[in-house]
Amino acid sequence: MSAVKAARYGKDNVRVYKVHKDEKTGVQTVYEMTVCVLLEGEIETSYTKADNSVIVATDSIKNTIYITAKQNPVTPPELFGSILGTHFIEKYNHIHAAHVNIVCHRWTRMDIDGKPHPHSFIRDSEEKRNVQVDVVEGKGIDIKSSLSGLTVLKSTNSQFWGFLRDEYTTLKETWDRILSTDVDATWQWKNFSGLQEVRSHVPKFDATWATAREVTLKTFAEDNSASVQATMYKMAEQILARQQLIETVEYSLPNKHYFEIDLSWHKGLQNTGKNAEVFAPQSDPNGLIKCTVGRSSLKSKL
C-alpha cells in the first residue's frame, strides 16, 4: 500500500517588475524580482485519485502574485512574501502552508552629469537580495533573508598556514595571498506570530540587509585573514550583535584560487613569491567553506 508522504506544488520563475512613480518630483523607482510560490495542504487526492478539485491552478497562483504586487508594496521583500503567503492560507481552507521564495534583481540608479537620474538605471552587478518566507497555519511566519552573488577580491592581507599536513598534502603555507569569493550570506529571523508582527518590524528588514552587506565588505577588506573560516565567523558574529531579531547567520564562501605563474623559464623572469604580479585565475576546482553561527543559547547541530 502506498501513501503520499509529502507534497507541495505551485508556480516558479514568475518574473515581476513594478515601478513607483512620484508625481510630485517625477522620480521613478523600479523593482524587479523572480517569485516562486509552493503550496501544501489537503491535496493528496490530486496525486492518488486524480482529483483536481483540490488544486489551486498554478496559473491562478501566478495571477495572484501579480495582483498582490499591484495592491501592496513589494519592498521590503520580506513583507511582500509574508503578505503573499498569508493570502493563500487565509483564502483556501484546505491550504495550510505557503512557501514563497523571492529573488530581487539589482537596478541601481544612474548618475548623469553628477546627479541621480529620475528614471534610468544600470545593472552594475549580478548581486541579488533574496528571501524565503514560510507561512504555516497555526505556526506563524518564518523568514530567511539573504544576499548572494556579491563577488569580492583583495590582493593581499590573506594568509593560510599551520594547517594539517600528511602524505596527501602538497599545498604550501602562505602568509600573503589573493582572496576572492562570491558571498552567499543568509540570516534567519525569529519566528513571527503573523503578518501583523511582520508589519511592525518592516524598517528592520532593509536596515539589516544593509548592515549585513556593510559588515561583510568591511570585515573582508580589513581583516588580515588567517583563513576563510576565521573571517566568515567574524562577519556572522557582528551581524548577530547588531540585530537581536536574528537567530542565526549562515555563510557559504567559495575560495576562488589565483595561482602564481612561474616565468623563470623565459630569460629568468621572476614572477613568484614577493615578485609575483601576474596570476592565472582558476575557474575550478575551488574551496567551499560553510558555517552557521547562532547565539550561544541555541543548540549546535554539529
Swiss-Prot record:
pH-dependence annotation: Optimum pH is 8.0.
EC class name: oxidoreductase
Assigned GO CC terms: peroxisome
Pathway named in the protein's UniProt entry: Purine metabolism; urate degradation; (S)-allantoin from urate: step 1/3
Binding site for O2: 58, 255
Keywords, comma-separated and alphabetical: Acetylation, Oxidoreductase, Peroxisome, Purine metabolism
Activation and inhibition: 8-Azaxanthine is one of the most potent competitive inhibitors of uricase activity. Hypoxanthine has only a small inhibitor effect, and caffeine has no effect at all. Azide not only competes with dioxygen but also competes with the substrate for its enzymatic site.
Locus of motif Microbody targeting signal: 300-302
Catalytic reaction equation(s): urate + O2 + H2O = 5-hydroxyisourate + H2O2
N-acetylserine modifications at: 2
Comment on activity versus temperature: Optimum temperature is 30 degrees Celsius.
Xref: SUPFAM superfamilies: Tetrahydrobiopterin biosynthesis enzymes-like
Key word Transmembrane present: no
A molecular function (GO) term: urate oxidase activity
Subunit structure and binding partners: Homotetramer.
Entry function: Urate oxidase is a cofactorless enzyme involved in the metabolism of purines. Catalyzes, in the presence of molecular oxygen, the hydroxylation of uric acid to metastable 5-hydroxyisourate (5-HIU) which is further degraded to allantoin.
Name of the featured protein: Uricase
Organism: Aspergillus flavus
